[in-house]
Design a protein with these regions (language model features):
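C-terminal beta-strand-rich structural cap/linker in extracellular carbohydrate-active enzymes
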Residues: 158-160, 189-199
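Aromatic (Trp/Tyr) and acidic
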Residues: 1-163, 171, 183
């Protein structure tokens, strides 16, 4: 039930870390579906927008009267707290947010996997060639992202885009032309010459 699930912030982070490692080992996007859900639905709710208060547990529904002392849910707080007796959540949240780049991308030699559609810029080296990758968009409020891959010279490489399990009519345009590609373990993989590409 929504009012009695525990959804501990640190347990959610552990789930995300496990999912990330499994996805990286198996190259299976279903793990990143779990990671994405954990990050958006629990981790981000565990910290206030100003970063000064936190939830230890994150039930989906809270009735303040049921959180009073000497009730079965007195450990649940109806508002975020500035600190806890056991304060693992605040540093764990900030550490996870600081390492978000490791969740967005995986790299294996000349292959780059785009796992999370979070606006960002990063630099990678594919086959010895420096590339700048830029993701632009307003996910999850909008369902369109632009991914720019900008290399200093042309090289053979592969870029894999995660197809979220909830995505309907997912398609990729490469330099304005629709790609006719098949899905492999939840990723659409595009291989070949890469230089200055827009997806």
């Amino acid at each position: 039930p929504n009012d009695s699930n525990y959804s501990e912030t640190c347990a959610t982070i552990a789930l995300a870390m496990f999912g990330k490692r499994m996805a990286d080992m198996e190259k299976d996007a279903s793990y990143m579906d779990v990671v994405e859900r954990a990050l958006y639905n629990t981790l981000l709710s565990g910290i206030a927008m100003d970063g000064k208060s936190f939830f230890y547990v994150n039930p989906l529904e809270v009735w303040p009267v049921s959180c009073m002392p000497r009730t079965s849910r007195e450990h649940v707080k109806p508002v975020r707290q500035k600190w806890f007796g056991v304060a693992c959540c605040p540093p764990n949240i900030t550490r996870t947010l600081a390492s978000l780049g490791q969740y967005i991308y995986f790299q294996e030699e000349n292959e780059i996997y785009v796992n999370l559609y979070v606006a960002n810029e990063t630099e990678v080296t594919l086959n010895g060639v420096p590339f700048k990758i830029t993701l632009k968009g307003n996910f999850p409020w909008e369902n369109k992202m632009t991914v720019s891959v900008d290399g200093v010279q042309e090289t053979e490489a592969m870029i894999a885009f995660r197809v979220p399990a909830y995505a309907e009519n997912f398609k990729i345009l490469r330099n304005g032309k629709e790609e006719n590609l098949t899905e492999d373990h939840g990723y659409i993989k595009i291989s070949g010459k890469m230089y200055k590409e827009t997806f």
